[in-house]
Regions:
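Short, Lys/Arg-rich, polar N-terminal cytosolic tail immediately upstream
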Residues: 1-33
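A structural signal for multi-pass alpha-helical bundles of membrane permease subunits
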Residues: 34-307
């Protein structure tokens, strides 16, 4: 072995280090400018969101989270009847609204000109402002001067009930007003959903003998089930937080017995000057509200949306 070979024994192959070159200085400066512009555009929206959403919610949770408030709330004789009213308002109002809207969406798709013309007045309660709709409904039922009681007296010579002198009549009036206001909106949504169902599916069902009720049960409703569920969950959220309907239709009458949680919280906060108790009253709806929101968000995250 020569001296040169001996020197090379134990020496591995030569190593090369490759240094990754970053973006040119010009590109780095452009990226920094883009990031600064992005922050500049996002900052106003973030500031508005923090000011008008995050801060009020956090402050309300801090204000109404004291255990003593919930003890005071449960001991108040108004609270438990209000919870019952809220359950009836949400349970009956939401389910009747959604199911009736689903049925009427099929009616308004019939190829009759007079049906299309009937759709215009049907949509009016939803098309007008919520305050106007609720005030109009209140005046239709007020005492003996209301439209409904006047029609009963003129047509059948009977005196109509005093709607706002009895608790369950007042709660029923609130529920009917909610249905009357929102059923047209969901009818339009279900009409749009029905129009996306291919006609070939109905033709195949007709060949198999599915008509009328059977076609609705086995074809239409399964195809609209996901849409129906999402709309029902969304309406439940709206109904739980609905303040305008009860406040303007019955106003809590008689003797504050027809309140729901939204209006009871307002009553505590402004009529009795106990804002913390009002927030606590609203927070008691969270055990229902949070699961509904979670289920709704999961349904909205489904990649393949089934009508």
């Amino acid at each position: 072995m020569s001296s040169t070979q001996g020197a090379l024994v134990g020496v591995g192959p030569p190593r090369f280090s490759i240094k990754r070159a970053g973006p040119p200085p010009k590109h780095r400066s452009l990226r920094g400018v883009e990031n600064r512009w992005a922050l500049a555009f996002v900052a106003p929206y973030a500031a508005v969101f923090v000011t008008f959403v995050v801060y009020p919610v956090a402050y309300a949770l801090w204000l109404g989270a004291r255990p003593s408030l919930f003890v005071e709330l449960i001991s108040d004789p108004l609270y438990l009847p209000t919870v019952v009213n809220t359950l009836f308002f949400v349970g009956i109002g939401v389910n009747v609204t959604m199911f009736a809207a689903l049925l009427l969406s099929g009616f308004f798709l019939r190829p009759r000109r007079w049906i299309r013309l009937l759709l215009v007045p049907y949509l009016l309660p939803w098309a007008i402002a919520t305050v106007q709709a609720c005030v109009s409904f209140h005046w239709m039922l007020i005492d003996q001067r209301g439209l409904l009681d006047g029609l009963l007296s003129a047509l059948f010579e009977i005196d109509g009930p005093l709607w706002f002198n009895h608790r369950w009549l007042a709660v029923g009036a609130n529920i009917i007003a909610f249905i009357w206001k929102w059923m047209p909106f969901w009818t339009v949504i279900f009409i749009a959903g029905r129009m996306t169902i291919p006609r070939a599916i109905y033709d195949a069902a007709s060949v198999d003998g599915a008509t009328g009720v059977r076609r609705f049960v086995h074809v239409t409703f399964p195809l609209l089930a996901n849409l129906y569920l999402i709309c029902t969950l969304l309406t439940t959220l709206w109904a739980l937080g609905d303040f305008t309907t009860t406040y303007l239709v019955s106003g809590g009458a008689p003797a504050l017995s027809s309140h729901v949680l939204a209006t009871l919280g307002f009553h505590y906060a402004f009529d009795t000057a106990k804002p913390a108790l009002g927030v606590a009253a609203m927070m008691t709806s969270l055990p229902v509200l949070i699961p509904v929101v979670i289920v709704l968000m999961r349904r909205l995250q489904v990649r393949e949306v089934q009508l």
